[in-house]
Protein backbone atom coordinates (compact mmCIF):
# COMPACT_ATOMS: atom_id res chain seq x y z
CA UNK A 1 0.00 0.00 0.00
CA UNK A 2 1.11 3.50 -0.74
CA UNK A 3 0.01 6.69 1.01
CA UNK A 4 -0.33 9.80 -1.05
CA UNK A 5 -1.98 13.14 -0.52
CA UNK A 6 -4.47 14.63 -2.93
CA UNK A 7 -5.31 18.29 -2.67
CA UNK A 8 -9.05 18.88 -2.35
CA UNK A 9 -10.02 21.52 -4.96
CA UNK A 10 -6.49 22.96 -4.74
CA UNK A 11 -6.56 23.35 -0.96
CA UNK A 12 -3.49 22.15 0.89
CA UNK A 13 -3.72 24.18 4.10
CA UNK A 14 -7.36 24.79 4.85
CA UNK A 15 -10.41 25.80 2.88
CA UNK A 16 -10.23 29.12 1.02
CA UNK A 17 -12.31 31.08 -1.46
CA UNK A 18 -9.67 30.23 -4.07
CA UNK A 19 -10.66 26.57 -4.31
CA UNK A 20 -11.29 25.23 -7.81
CA UNK A 21 -9.70 28.31 -9.44
CA UNK A 22 -7.42 27.16 -12.29
CA UNK A 23 -4.33 29.01 -11.02
CA UNK A 24 -4.91 27.69 -7.48
CA UNK A 25 -5.09 24.14 -8.81
CA UNK A 26 -1.87 24.73 -10.76
CA UNK A 27 -0.19 25.96 -7.57
CA UNK A 28 -1.05 22.68 -5.81
CA UNK A 29 0.19 20.66 -8.79
CA UNK A 30 3.42 22.69 -8.82
CA UNK A 31 3.91 21.70 -5.17
CA UNK A 32 3.69 18.03 -6.18
CA UNK A 33 0.07 17.24 -5.29
CA UNK A 34 -2.54 15.45 -7.29
CA UNK A 35 -5.76 17.49 -7.14
CA UNK A 36 -9.43 16.53 -6.90
CA UNK A 37 -11.42 19.07 -8.91
CA UNK A 38 -15.14 19.65 -9.49
CA UNK A 39 -16.34 20.11 -13.06
CA UNK A 40 -19.62 21.10 -14.70
CA UNK A 41 -20.59 20.89 -18.37
CA UNK A 42 -23.21 23.48 -19.28
CA UNK A 43 -24.10 24.76 -22.74
CA UNK A 44 -21.12 23.05 -24.41
CA UNK A 45 -18.71 24.70 -21.96
CA UNK A 46 -16.68 23.21 -19.10
CA UNK A 47 -16.42 24.91 -15.73
CA UNK A 48 -14.70 24.37 -12.40
CA UNK A 49 -16.67 24.97 -9.22
CA UNK A 50 -18.08 23.07 -6.27
CA UNK A 51 -21.66 24.24 -5.78
CA UNK A 52 -21.96 25.99 -9.13
CA UNK A 53 -20.08 26.48 -12.38
CA UNK A 54 -17.61 29.32 -11.72
CA UNK A 55 -14.40 29.13 -13.74
CA UNK A 56 -14.50 28.30 -17.44
CA UNK A 57 -11.88 25.84 -18.69
CA UNK A 58 -11.64 23.55 -21.71
CA UNK A 59 -10.71 19.94 -22.42
CA UNK A 60 -7.16 20.98 -23.29
CA UNK A 61 -6.74 22.41 -19.78
CA UNK A 62 -7.77 19.04 -18.33
CA UNK A 63 -5.63 17.07 -20.81
CA UNK A 64 -2.51 19.10 -19.96
CA UNK A 65 -2.90 18.15 -16.28
CA UNK A 66 -4.50 14.72 -16.60
CA UNK A 67 -1.77 12.80 -14.77
CA UNK A 68 -2.45 14.91 -11.65
CA UNK A 69 -6.27 15.31 -11.72
CA UNK A 70 -9.08 13.40 -10.04
CA UNK A 71 -12.15 14.84 -11.76
CA UNK A 72 -15.43 14.93 -9.83
CA UNK A 73 -18.27 15.35 -12.33
CA UNK A 74 -20.89 17.59 -10.74
CA UNK A 75 -23.65 17.18 -13.31
CA UNK A 76 -24.74 14.45 -15.70
CA UNK A 77 -23.55 16.23 -18.86
CA UNK A 78 -20.04 16.46 -17.34
CA UNK A 79 -20.10 12.73 -16.65
CA UNK A 80 -21.25 11.97 -20.20
CA UNK A 81 -18.49 14.16 -21.63
CA UNK A 82 -15.80 12.55 -19.44
CA UNK A 83 -16.92 9.09 -20.64
CA UNK A 84 -15.62 10.11 -24.07
CA UNK A 85 -12.11 10.84 -22.70
CA UNK A 86 -9.27 8.93 -21.07
CA UNK A 87 -9.26 11.32 -18.10
CA UNK A 88 -9.55 10.10 -14.49
CA UNK A 89 -13.07 10.97 -13.35
CA UNK A 90 -15.90 9.88 -11.09
CA UNK A 91 -19.45 10.76 -10.12
CA UNK A 92 -21.14 10.52 -6.74
CA UNK A 93 -23.85 12.30 -4.87
CA UNK A 94 -24.62 10.80 -1.49
CA UNK A 95 -23.42 7.29 -2.32
CA UNK A 96 -21.25 5.63 0.31
CA UNK A 97 -18.68 4.72 -2.34
CA UNK A 98 -18.13 5.07 -6.04
CA UNK A 99 -15.57 3.67 -8.46
CA UNK A 100 -13.40 6.04 -10.48
CA UNK A 101 -12.82 5.53 -14.19
CA UNK A 102 -9.45 3.99 -13.25
CA UNK A 103 -11.10 1.43 -10.95
CA UNK A 104 -10.23 3.07 -7.61
CA UNK A 105 -12.74 3.12 -4.75
CA UNK A 106 -13.70 6.66 -3.68
CA UNK A 107 -15.35 6.65 -0.24
CA UNK A 108 -17.79 9.38 0.81
CA UNK A 109 -16.67 11.42 3.86
CA UNK A 110 -19.69 10.18 5.84
CA UNK A 111 -18.32 6.62 6.02
CA UNK A 112 -15.24 5.06 7.53
CA UNK A 113 -12.57 4.55 4.85
CA UNK A 114 -12.32 1.13 3.27
CA UNK A 115 -9.06 -0.68 2.69
CA UNK A 116 -7.69 0.21 -0.73
CA UNK A 117 -9.94 3.25 -0.99
CA UNK A 118 -9.58 6.97 -1.10
CA UNK A 119 -10.49 8.35 2.32
CA UNK A 120 -12.04 11.73 1.61
CA UNK A 121 -11.48 14.48 4.19
CA UNK A 122 -10.09 12.32 7.01
CA UNK A 123 -9.16 15.48 8.92
CA UNK A 124 -12.51 15.17 10.64
CA UNK A 125 -10.94 12.38 12.67
CA UNK A 126 -7.19 12.98 12.47
CA UNK A 127 -6.86 16.76 12.41
CA UNK A 128 -5.63 17.35 8.85
CA UNK A 129 -7.29 20.10 6.78
CA UNK A 130 -8.76 19.57 3.32
CA UNK A 131 -6.37 16.84 2.26
CA UNK A 132 -7.48 13.53 0.83
CA UNK A 133 -5.51 10.45 1.87
CA UNK A 134 -5.27 7.78 -0.77
CA UNK A 135 -4.43 4.15 -0.33
CA UNK A 136 -3.37 2.81 -3.70
CA UNK A 137 -2.18 -0.72 -4.33
CA UNK A 138 1.05 -0.74 -6.32
CA UNK A 139 1.24 -3.61 -8.81
Show the residue positions of the predicted features.
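Phosphate-group recognition and catalysis centered on beta-loop-alpha active-site segments
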Residues: 1-139
